[in-house]
Amino acid sequence: MIGWWISILSLPPEEADKLIGREATAPHMLANWEVGTSGLRWLNDLVDAGKAQKLKNEGYPSRYVAKAADVLPFIETPKEWMRQLVHRPENIEKCSAETVLTIDAWDLS
């Protein structure tokens, strides 16, 4: 599969980096899924609109930050191109609009 694995945590990057393992990330994971090669378009559109910031562009991972208000509407209505989507509404409900999210995109090529 050529594409990306995207995960969204309800923590700023400096806090997300402290988490090790699935048990540690589970309470903060909002959603994760697999997409094809154009699957970062929505993130880059947020960056272009000034609603997200790209922190790293390495692919291992590429990292973005954005406020929940700008990302949650997107993930609450899953798109057909989001493969293997794991959606965690119980964690999403805990986010305020101002929560800073860490969005990691791992290159699957």
Which residue ranges define each predicted feature?
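Acidic (Asp/Glu-rich) sequence patches and key acidic residues
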Residues: 1-97, 107-109
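Short, hydrophobic/proline-enriched secondary-structure or compact coil segments at domain edges
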Residues: 101-105
